[in-house]
Amino acid sequence: MLQSFTQLGTLQQRIGNRSWGGEAQSAAGTQRGNPIWGRIEASHSEFEPGTSTTGTDYDADLWRLQAGLDMLLSETASGMLVGGLTVHYGTVKSDVSSSFGTGSIDATGYGFGGTLTWYGKNGFYVDTQAELTWFDSDLSSATLGRKLADGNNGFGYGLGIEAGQKIALHGNWSLTPQAQLSYASVAFDSFTDPYGALVSNGSSDSLIGRLGLSADYESEWKGSAGQTSRSHVYGIANLYYDFLDGTDVDVSGTRLTSKPQQLWGGLGVGGSLSWADDHYSVHGELLARTSLEDFGDSHAFGGSVGFSVKW
């Protein structure tokens, strides 16, 4: 369940559209300046693992607030290199059902991270991310009517790389094929439940690959004061695949495993709007995903909205 908090988003979800066609603002057609930005995301997911020792199904309701500062590190005739620092805070709540009963997990996560992004003059980009997250979790059993753990500590981290190429089409239209690879790992402190069972961390890692294609439409105009405004709307289709074997925990010497359905598909729509010569901008995205192995059994939907101010 904590894995859902450590999964990294896309460049577009994080900061919206920083690279524009038309009259380029820089060698890379990318907004100059050092933006301060923030965004909030929320999602609801339901999971039926492909295999599970205990027949566990669970859902996850997540919200997360993220903020950051980006700075131009280098600019050449071929493109721009932008670095960033981020902080995040949020919660995730999960209701769990298995052959042994039902329960819930409530977790709070907070942490920080860093980003490094290359915007090429030819429309090519590469984005890298790293995040560290600390967790505080409460585990309860509805079947037993009591808490199993209170304030259990955990730690997770995520690493990711994304690359894409904007391909100009007729007029204001373009296509952006893109690929992303994200690794996440989560661990929690061992604890003993009220009945003396020792619960300890096994492995909880994921390596998710994403192939996506977005269709983009951009426009720009000048207001009465002569300042430029821009808009960008897009639709995106994604395929996801988890290359690893899921999670496992040890309960008093018994290994319990859960392996997710590995192949997923998703569709999304979103957009960005900037004004006052790109000093201010807002962006957002809505996204739905489902497992393609047992279509609809595992699914997720969510959205994010953000803003940035350039100084």
List each model region and its residues:
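Long, low-complexity repeat tracts used as extracellular stalks/passenger repeats
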Residues: 1-14, 18, 34-36
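Membrane translocator/pore-forming domains, dominated by Gram-negative outer-membrane beta-barrels
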Residues: 5, 30-35, 39-311
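A short, compositionally biased domain-edge/stem linker segment
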Residues: 16-27
